[in-house]
Amino acid sequence: MRSPRVLGLVLAGGAGKRLAPLTADRAKPAVPFGGIYRLVDFVLSNLVNGGYLRIAVLTQYKSHSLDRHITTTWRMSNLLGNYVTPVPAQQRLGPQWFAGSADAIHQSLNLVHDEAPDVVVVFGADHVYRMDPRQMVAQHLETGAGVTVAGLRVPRSEGSAFGVIRTADDGVTIAEFLEKPADPPGLPGSPDEIFASMGNYVFTTDVLIDALRADAADPESVHDMGGSIVPMLVEQGTAAVYDFAANQVPGALERDHGYWRDVGTLDSYFDAHMDLCALDPVFNLYNRDWPIYTNVPPSVPPAKFVHDTPGRVGVATDSIVSNGVIISGGAVRRSVLSPGVRVNSWSVVENAVVMDNSVIGRRAVVRDAILDKNVVVPPGATVGVDKEHDRARGYQVSEAGVTVVGKGVTIAD
């Protein structure tokens, strides 16, 4: 029996408004993460590690940096017809942009027809996690479902923040798909948990095509995969759930098994970075059996730490320090530094995410903050120390008190 022919479609058109100002000049999937990665690298690494090597990334909003990252990083050998390619909105069906995630795929059905897959894997582009998609595809084929939805077990008390899956008594068939219900139903045998939709789907190809065409013809539809297509197939009795907790990733540790983060807000984005900095991180970037791939410029030199005199020590603890960083007599604690960052003498960077080529001046303090690329913190200046002062200077402060500074800003007094 031959292996199924699989096409990967990655939904990467999100604007990510809740991540502003980090999305002022880039699409959400292009937002940097973890020092050297982009958010889109996680889903693409999962698909490629799983052996799914024909992938179209559907883009739309401010996609230049995302398109450039994909074309420079994800270059597959085309000897066997493999590819990872960005596909911008092309207005194939008329002079309009994508009206939703389902419309994005409907307008790109030529890709499906050209590839003629048995199965279409439709994954989102802006979550941090590891997953072996082969196991989800195997269950999909075994059950004969039209669509299989990846479900994440979360406490029932948090169900109002998610699309919630109610299963039939068999625990697999989806009986109902509820969008952010006030009183979500618990799981059979585990009433204090619910299945939250992860936004990852596996479709039988002809079922997907028929559903997209029916949805496109419905003027009342919101043309969304979770809001339109999945409920349609639930009603037809052909939808199943895949329990993400059952997914076994090669090389995964017990503590990071089942890790999944939606980093759609500034606070969740910040918290996911802090997850990386722990002594025993709940998400392990160093799994060699299931690597997260990205583009690291070969010309960037290693990190450098200088000065070791009383009161002036270049040091970083509980932190991720990327290539090209120079910590020159400053102290870095529980932070993530991207390539090219410079931390100068007597400065302190604590509980912070500092992106490429930002400069922290002498005796400056950066605390509980996110700095986008090319930010300059002048000598003696502070960021994140006085939240009211940060707001007065025009910097965004999140609900949890994280100060966020946009790209290319020089911090004002």
Swiss-Prot record:
Family of the protein in this entry: Belongs to the bacterial/plant glucose-1-phosphate adenylyltransferase family.
Organism: Parafrankia sp. (strain EAN1pec)
GO molecular function, one term: ATP binding
Subunit: Homotetramer.
Family annotation (Gene3D superfamilies): Hexapeptide repeat proteins (2.160.10.10), Spore Coat Polysaccharide Biosynthesis Protein SpsA, Chain A (3.90.550.10)
Its biological purpose: Involved in the biosynthesis of ADP-glucose, a building block required for the elongation reactions to produce glycogen. Catalyzes the reaction between ATP and alpha-D-glucose 1-phosphate (G1P) to produce pyrophosphate and ADP-Glc.
Keyword DNA-binding: no
Listed InterPro entries: ADP-Glc_PPase, ADP_Glu_pyroP_CS, GlgC_bac, GlmU/GlgC-like_hexapep, NTP_transferase_dom, Nucleotide-diphossugar_trans, Trimer_LpxA-like_sf
Taxonomic superkingdom: Bacteria
CDD domains the UniProt entry points to: ADP_Glucose_PP, LbH_G1P_AT_C
Reactions the enzyme catalyzes: alpha-D-glucose 1-phosphate + ATP + H(+) = ADP-alpha-D-glucose + diphosphate
PROSITE patterns listed in its UniProt record: ADP_GLC_PYROPHOSPH_1, ADP_GLC_PYROPHOSPH_2, ADP_GLC_PYROPHOSPH_3
Annotated positions binding alpha-D-glucose 1-phosphate: G163, E179, K180, S197
Keywords for this protein: ATP-binding, Carbohydrate metabolism, Glycogen biosynthesis, Glycogen metabolism, Nucleotide-binding, Nucleotidyltransferase, Transferase
Pathway field: Glycan biosynthesis; glycogen biosynthesis
Pfam families: Hexapep_GlmU, NTP_transferase
Protein's recorded name: Glucose-1-phosphate adenylyltransferase
GO biological process, any: glycogen biosynthetic process
Enzyme Commission number(s) of this protein: 2.7.7.27
Enzyme class: transferase
HAMAP family given in the database record: GlgC (MF_00624)
UniProt-listed SUPFAM superfamilies: Nucleotide-diphospho-sugar transferases (SSF53448), Trimeric LpxA-like enzymes (SSF51161)
